[in-house]
C-alpha cells in the first residue's frame, strides 16, 4: 500500500501541481507590465560616437537585442552577476571579494544538471549514448566499487556550503527566511538519500525503471504491481523528490524560469536612444501640449493639456517666470 501511495499516487499529484504552477507563474510574469526601464549595469552605455565601448561594455550594458541575448546567455550558463560579487563595507570604506558564492552556485547547478542527465536513463528506453558516455566520464571506474559519481558528492558539498553561508554569515542570516532554509534542507535530504541508496542501502534499479516507465506511459495497473516490490529506501528518495516538484513553482527555486522575465536582465540599456513607454500611463489624457518653450528653447514632456502641465510643475514654472523668462506652451 505504501508503494502505491508514494510510487503512483503522490508522483502524479506532484507533476500535476508542478505543471499547473509553472504555467500559472509564467503567464502571470508574461502579463506583468514593466513601467520603468531598469537594466542593472556597470558598463558604459552607448552614447556619442567618440565614447568607445569595449566587449565587456557591450554585454554588461547591451544596446541591441543581440547584445541583450548574449548577456542573458552569460547570466544563465555562467552566472555573470555572481561572478562580479563584491561585498562593500561602508563603515570601513573597504571591499572584499565574495566570488566564493559564484563558485558554490556553479558547483551546485552544474552538479544538478549532471545528476538529472544521469537520472534520465530511468525514463528513456533505449538510453541515449551520450548519457552512457557522460556517466563513464564522471565515474571513478576501477577505483571504487561501486563507481563513485563526482556530481553526486559535489552537489551535497555545494548545498552544505550554501546552507552554512546562511547560518554563519550575519547579514545572510538576517535576510534569510524559513523558506530559504527549507528549500536547502529539502534538496539536501533528496541528494543524501540518493547517495545512501547508491552506496549503502540498495534498491532494485531494474524494478525502479520499470515503475517509472509505467508511470510515463500511464500504465497504472503495471505500475501498481511493480510498486509493491521495490525497497522502502527508494520511496524515501522518490517522495522527497515529488514533494520538491510540487513545492517548486511556489518557492524561490522558480528563479530558474523567472530569470527570463527579469527586466533588470532582459532589457537593453538604450534609454538615450529609445523612449520606454509606461504601459500604466492612462490613455485618455488630453494631448494638447508637448512641452514648453523658454528663451527660444523647447523642453519636451508628456503630451498634456496646459492646465494639467502647469499644476504638475507649478513651483518650477513660477521660478522661471520670476527670472523674467517668457513661458509659451508648445502646441501640437
Swiss-Prot record:
Organism per entry: Archaeoglobus fulgidus (strain ATCC 49558 / DSM 4304 / JCM 9628 / NBRC 100126 / VC-16)
The organism's taxonomic lineage, starting at the top: Archaea, Methanobacteriati, Methanobacteriota, Archaeoglobi, Archaeoglobales
Quaternary data: Consists of five subunits: an integral membrane subunit, a cytochrome b-like subunit, a cytochrome c subunit and two iron-sulfur subunits.
Ranges that cross the membrane: 3-23, 97-117, 143-163, 177-197, 230-250
GO cellular component: plasma membrane
Keywords: Cell membrane, Electron transport, Membrane, Oxidoreductase, Transmembrane, Transmembrane helix, Transport
Its biological purpose: Has menaquinol-oxidizing activity. HmeC and HmeD subunits may together mediate electron transfer from menaquinol to an unidentified electron acceptor on the cytoplasmic side of the membrane.
A Pfam family it matches: Nitrate_red_gam
Topological relation to the membrane, as annotated: Multi-pass membrane protein
Name of the featured protein: Hdr-like menaquinol oxidoreductase cytochrome b-like subunit
GO biological process: anaerobic electron transport chain
PANTHER family: NITRATE REDUCTASE PRIVATE CHAPERONE, REDOX ENZYME MATURATION PROTEIN REMP FAMILY (PTHR30598), RESPIRATORY NITRATE REDUCTASE 1 GAMMA CHAIN (PTHR30598:SF3)
Main location: membrane
Gene name of this polypeptide: hmeC
Places the protein is found: Cell membrane
Amino acid at each position: 500500500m505504501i508503494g502505491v501511495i508514494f510510487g503512483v499516487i503522490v508522483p502524479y499529484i506532484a507533476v500535476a501541481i508542478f505543471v499547473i504552477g509553472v504555467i500559472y507563474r509564467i503567464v502571470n510574469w508574461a502579463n506583468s507590465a514593466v513601467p520603468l526601464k531598469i537594466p542593472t549595469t556597470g558598463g558604459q552605455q552607448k552614447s556619442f560616437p567618440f565614447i568607445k565601448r569595449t566587449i565587456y561594455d557591450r554585454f554588461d550594458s547591451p544596446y541591441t537585442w543581440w547584445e541583450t541575448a548574449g548577456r542573458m546567455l552569460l547570466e544563465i550558463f555562467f552566472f555573470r552577476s555572481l561572478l562580479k560579487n563584491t561585498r562593500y563595507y561602508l563603515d570601513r570604506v573597504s571591499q572584499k571579494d565574495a566570488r566564493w558564492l559564484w563558485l558554490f552556485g556553479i558547483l551546485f547547478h552544474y552538479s544538478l544538471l549532471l545528476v538529472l542527465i544521469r537520472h534520465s536513463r530511468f525514463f528513456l528506453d533505449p538510453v541515449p549514448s551520450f548519457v552512457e558516455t557522460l556517466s563513464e566520464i564522471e565515474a571513478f571506474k576501477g577505483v571504487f566499487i561501486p563507481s563513485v559519481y563526482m556530481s553526486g558528492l559535489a552537489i551535497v558539498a555545494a548545498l552544505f556550503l550554501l546552507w552554512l553561508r546562511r547560518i554563519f554569515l550575519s547579514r545572510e542570516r538576517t535576510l534569510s527566511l524559513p523558506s530559504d532554509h527549507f528549500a536547502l534542507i529539502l534538496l539536501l535530504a533528496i541528494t543524501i538519500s540518493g547517495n545512501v541508496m547508491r552506496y549503502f542501502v540498495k534498491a532494485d534499479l531494474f524494478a525502479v525503471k520499470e515503475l517509472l516507465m509505467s508511470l510515463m506511459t500511464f500504465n497504472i495497473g503495471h505500475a501498481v504491481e511493480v510498486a509493491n516490490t521495490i525497497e522502502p529506501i527508494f520511496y524515501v528518495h522518490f517522495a522527497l523528490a515529488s514533494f520538491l516538484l510540487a513545492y517548486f513553482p511556489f518557492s524561490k527555486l522558480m528563479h530558474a524560469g523567472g530569470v527570463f522575465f527579469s527586466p533588470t536582465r532582459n532589457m537593453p540599456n538604450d534609454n538615450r536612444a529609445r523612449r520606454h513607454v509606461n504601459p500604466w500611463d492612462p490613455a485618455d489624457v488630453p494631448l494638447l501640449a508637448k512641452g514648453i518653450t523658454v528663451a527660444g528653447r523647447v523642453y519636451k514632456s508628456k503630451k498634456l493639456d496646459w492646465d494639467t502641465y502647469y499644476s504638475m510643475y507649478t513651483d518650477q514654472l513660477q521660478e522661471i517666470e520670476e527670472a523674467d523668462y517668457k513661458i509659451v506652451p508648445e502646441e501640437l
